Amino acid sequence: MSTPRGLAILGSTGSIGRSTLEVVALHPEWYRVAVLGAHRSWQSIVEQAKRFNPDLVVLVDPEAAAQARAALRDCGSTARVECGAEALAAAASGDNVQVVMAAIVGAAGLKSTLAAVHAAKRVLLANKEALVMAGTLLMDEVRRAGAEIIPIDSEHNAIFQCMPGGYLPGDVARGVTRVILTASGGPFRCADAGSLTNVTPDEACAHPKWKMGRKISVDSATLMNKGLEIIEATLLFGLPETQVDVLVHPQSVVHSLVEYADGSMLAQLGAPDMRTPIAQALAWPARFASGVKSLNLAEIGQLAFEPPDHQRFPSLMLARGAARAGGTAPALLNAANEVAVQAFLDRRLNFTAIATVIDRVLQRLDSSPVKALSDVLDADAAARRLAEALIEPGSGVFA
């Protein structure tokens, strides 16, 4: 690389953001960190700014931004500090940025992701919720603006790697008959159904293979993570929901498979470490080191696969239903899930009731066509209001 490319890391203090910085630190000739963005973790972002010396630091929370501004001024940093969601979107589309790591969890990352796409950036998409909520709008804008999307989710990144040479998400996946997403099964893969009601947030977040944030860890435990990934796969790779399968694979070594019309099946294997898909996306179409230890298949010995249990984990079927319905249904599903998961983490809702809340929201709110971003945001807000009302003590829903 002659001149390092400007990189914006939105969600830099989260798990994906921190892993991205680890990989980037190995390759200063490839990337210069131009923007660091987060919600309110100002102490963490200040430490990152001291090390990587970005042009701009953005914190959505105004108080956190003020704290960061003072701390960086005191240490002599020249980084500008701005606040608010609009500043985050502006940073994602700035002239000093060529590549955007979109890693802000949940609906909060939607506007900045859309801004990066609109500005024709290469977007490394770790925020699956943005695609689930506004997938048709997002992918249409990718094609219109000439942006590039490279998925960071280990499963979708694996599919991307197994696609024909030169393929980019949004293109027609010619010759592909099926993609298979693998799931570890989460911490409750072997748990008795009756025991799931009383599991704690800490138990749900104790993933057997991956180190992740708490929200995505709960999604993995309910298998909603895989449900969102089904929707994501239909949008990224232009496949109907019926051509996206799920297999439970406890070893988390095979990250996904792609089946072709001639009967061939290609799989991508690797250690369960997010630095691998991050490095692949950062270097694409080349390759560089991720810092991840090589996979020892002889040591692993066996690879097992089994179908998911839809009775114990109903979130998968709820997500498939939303994928088939289209329109605002995925946004309703995502919003209800975010509210229910947070209520579970706050100990206001039991584990098995997460799916119940989502189901009730989908039953009560009709899906409608998506013609503009406002349609998605209105559906998101309505689903959040209803989910909160259902969870509220005295609602009678869980009596």
What would you call each of these model-derived segments?
Residues 1-399:
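Catalytic, metal-anchored helix/loop core of enzyme active sites in primary metabolism
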